[in-house]
């Protein structure tokens, strides 16, 4: 099946792409929703649906994968927050509809790779959009054990770094910029102590993927800065803002059903 992957830049959307390919599907394009460039606080958009931290590096992510990238600016807000979503003009979900509608027209995809693990809110809305467009959502991580998933991601050579923290026990000065393999023991410890979701499904942290077996080049962070979003004494919210990045060549093979062709479509 020809598949487009919804990506945030994080580990989950990346690992779900790997699962799609393992299942015999072909990733032919990437799709991403981003905040408006002139929007105040655009690095960390208050959205129920989308991860926006790290969005400045998404173009480089697509270049690393050598795949076409479709990006749409998020124009809507979270208006219909009921359990069952229905089409609602001005809702941010309709931005996803317009994005995937274009991707389907341009790339003739039949399925959408989705990295959802636990959020019914996100799953229901993605399924609503896919049903309206006659697309098949592919969510191989859905309701998987999070400790198992994190272990698999690390053993599958997904190199992702923590770019946002927002939970008790996560310190911006200590943990931002750390990689998954460096954080795994501590995340498991936090899960046992405070009930933190090991994969960050409660919004405890977010990641950005620097390398994985699907990348033809790896992303190198040359410089970044810490931005404090909320200086809570017990659970401060902070994120990394990338300042300089570049791609570095790597010697690796990609699966036979993985085809590459890079261009970016913004609207």
Swiss-Prot record:
Catalytic activity entry: diphthine-[translation elongation factor 2] + NH4(+) + ATP = diphthamide-[translation elongation factor 2] + AMP + diphosphate + H(+)
PTM annotation (Phosphotyrosine): residues: 97
Assigned keywords, A-Z: ATP-binding, Ligase, Nucleotide-binding, Phosphoprotein
GO terms for MF: ATP binding; diphthine-ammonia ligase activity
Source taxon at top rank: Eukaryota
Pfam families reported for this sequence: Diphthami_syn_2 (PF01902)
Keyword Ligase applies: yes
Gene Ontology annotations of biological process type: protein histidyl modification to diphthamide
One Gene Ontology term, aspect cellular component: cytosol
UniProt name for this protein: Diphthine--ammonia ligase
Source organism: Homo sapiens (Human)
């Amino acid at each position: 099946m020809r598949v487009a992957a919804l990506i945030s830049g994080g580990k989950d959307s990346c690992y779900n792409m790997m699962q799609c390919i393992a299942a015999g599907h072909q990733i032919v394009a990437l799709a991403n929703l981003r905040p408006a460039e002139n929007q105040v606080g655009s690095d960390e958009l208050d959205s129920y649906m989308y991860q926006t931290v790290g969005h400045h590096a998404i173009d480089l992510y697509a270049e690393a994968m050598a795949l076409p990238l479709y990006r749409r600016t998020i124009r809507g807000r979270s208006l219909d927050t009921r359990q069952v979503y229905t089409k609602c003009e001005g809702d941010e979900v309709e931005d996803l509809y317009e994005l995937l509608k274009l991707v389907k027209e341009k790339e003739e995809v039949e399925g959408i790779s989705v990295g959802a693990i636990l959020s019914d809110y996100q799953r229901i809305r993605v399924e609503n959009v896919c049903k309206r467009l006659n697309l098949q959502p592919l969510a191989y991580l859905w309701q998987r054990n999070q400790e198992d998933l994190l272990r698999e991601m690390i053993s599958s050579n997904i190199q992702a770094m923590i770019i946002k923290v927002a939970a008790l026990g996560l310190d911006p000065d200590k943990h931002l910029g750390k990689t998954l393999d460096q954080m795994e023991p501590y995340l498991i410890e936090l899960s046992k102590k405070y009930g933190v979701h090991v994969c960050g499904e409660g919004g405890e942290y977010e990641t950005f993927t620097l390398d994985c077996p699907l990348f033809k080049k790896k992303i190198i962070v040359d410089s970044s800065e810490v931005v404090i979003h909320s200086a809570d004494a017990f659970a401060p919210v902070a994120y990394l803002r990338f300042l300089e990045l570049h791609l570095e060549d790597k010697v690796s093979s990609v699966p036979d059903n993985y085809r590459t062709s890079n261009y970016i479509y913004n609207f």
